[in-house]
């Protein structure tokens, strides 16, 4: 462990997780350099363009024994991505958008669910999310969904891993500071699924959360785990009112 990293760890370990005031919230877009911003702004030749085209094709393609496409049931999905994760009364649990689309695929199209984090599901999610781009995030909190919000908030503030760090210590208390030469963002999930230059591909919010857990040397959950959905729900609520950027680009 280098001296610089050790000192940084001491600073982060001592920091308290004070929530960011609503007026001071900033999208990760604002922490990026000019060239990376230009990639996100270019929807025609930007790095996410191919996933959007694949998503549109999947949306229109008939699938399953029902021989139906998403387009056969839904004229458009404007505003939908801005409302997820959402509570499903029939299943008595929170669902994120990928889970909801897979349920529709299985129950309505009579087709196999798409694998979580697969190119197909990421493409479809990006295409659906793109229709809400520029719209404010509107997460509904009800009596039945509040326990999931509280669980997500607790996870965000809980120290974990061998480094004994919480999400809040980085993204509430130390945002804007530099870690290994990179500005620490506020961790608002305004652009998922997004194209990450580090990955050279699209990825979901859960992929990013797994990366963070591995970074603090904690054991990551499996994709689709309830713990991730609760944290997603809290993070989207934390970003309420901010504009959706899907599909975003990040370093």
Name the predicted role of every residue range.
Residues 2, 7, 15-51, 85, ...:
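Post-cleavage N-terminal segment of exported redox proteins
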Residues 41-74:
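N-terminal, post-signal-peptide region of Sec/Tat-exported proteins
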Residues 65-77, 124, 152, 163-174, ...:
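The canonical Cys-X-X-Cys-His
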Residues 78-86, 179-185:
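Short cysteine/histidine-rich zinc-coordinating motifs and their immediately flanking basic loops
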Residues 130-182:
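Extended amphipathic alpha-helical interaction segments
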Residues 163-164, 176-182, 215-222, 241-243:
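Substrate-binding/catalytic groove segments of enzymes
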Residues 184-191, 250:
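Solvent-exposed, glycine/polar-rich loop segments of beta-barrel outer-membrane systems
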């Amino acid at each position: 462990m280098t001296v610089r990293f050790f000192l940084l760890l001491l600073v982060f370990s001592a920091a308290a997780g004070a929530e960011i005031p609503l007026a001071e919230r900033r999208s990760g877009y604002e922490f990026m350099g000019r060239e990376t911003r230009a990639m996100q702004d270019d929807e025609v030749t930007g790095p996410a363009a191919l996933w959007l085209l694949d998503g549109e094709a999947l949306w229109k393609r008939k699938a399953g024994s029902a021989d139906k496409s998403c387009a056969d049931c839904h004229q458009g999905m404007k505003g939908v991505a801005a409302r997820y994760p959402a509570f499903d009364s029939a299943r008595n649990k929170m669902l994120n958008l990928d889970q909801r689309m897979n349920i529709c695929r299985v129950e309505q199209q009579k087709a196999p669910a798409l694998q979580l984090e697969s190119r197909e599901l990421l493409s479809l999610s990006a295409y659906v999310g793109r229709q809400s781009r520029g719209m404010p995030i509107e997460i509904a909190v009800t009596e039945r969904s509040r326990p999931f919000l509280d669980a997500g908030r607790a996870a965000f503030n809980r120290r974990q891993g061998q480094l004994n760090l919480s999400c809040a210590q980085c993204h509430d208390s130390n945002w804007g500071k530099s870690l290994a030469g990179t500005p620490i963002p506020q961790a608002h999930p305004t652009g998922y699924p997004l194209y990450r230059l580090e990955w050279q591909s699209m990825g979901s919010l859960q992929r990013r959360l797994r990366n963070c857990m591995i970074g603090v040397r904690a054991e990551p959950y499996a994709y689709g785990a309830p713990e991730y959905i609760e944290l997603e729900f809290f993070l989207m609520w934390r970003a309420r009112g901010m504009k959706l950027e899907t599909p975003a680009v990040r370093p």
